[in-house]
Amino acid sequence: MCLAIPSKVVEIKDNNMAVVDTLGVSREASLDLLNESVNIGDWVLLHIGYVMSKIDEESARESLRLYEQILQSMQEEENERIEANK
């Protein structure tokens, strides 16, 4: 199973690279696998350093909301596990 994370394009660089914001973290990503142009402000799906496709903002925000719920749930489970082992 592969996960692609919604990310917002914040800068277009030379050599077919972009800087994207992924959950508040900026990183460089390759545009080599994308068959369409991207602009600053576009939402894309990022997988292992490659932009896979463009997506609309509504889909991106919904996916990010679900990721945040998953992360929160995982953190709560970890906290419960730590408390149980004290």
Swiss-Prot record:
<protein>
    <recommendedName>
        <fullName>Hydrogenase maturation factor HypC</fullName>
    </recommendedName>
</protein>
<comment type="function">
    <text>Involved in the maturation of [NiFe] hydrogenases. Involved in the biosynthesis of the Fe(CN)(2)CO cofactor.</text>
</comment>
<dbReference type="InterPro" id="IPR001109">
    <property type="entry name" value="Hydrogenase_HupF/HypC"/>
</dbReference>
<dbReference type="GO" id="GO:0051604">
    <property type="term" value="P:protein maturation"/>
</dbReference>
<dbReference type="Pfam" id="PF01455">
    <property type="entry name" value="HupF_HypC"/>
</dbReference>
<comment type="similarity">
    <text>Belongs to the HupF/HypC family.</text>
</comment>
<dbReference type="GO" id="GO:0005506">
    <property type="term" value="F:iron ion binding"/>
</dbReference>
<dbReference type="InterPro" id="IPR019812">
    <property type="entry name" value="Hydgase_assmbl_chp_CS"/>
</dbReference>
<comment type="pathway">
    <text>Protein modification; [NiFe] hydrogenase maturation.</text>
</comment>
<dbReference type="GO" id="GO:1902670">
    <property type="term" value="F:carbon dioxide binding"/>
</dbReference>
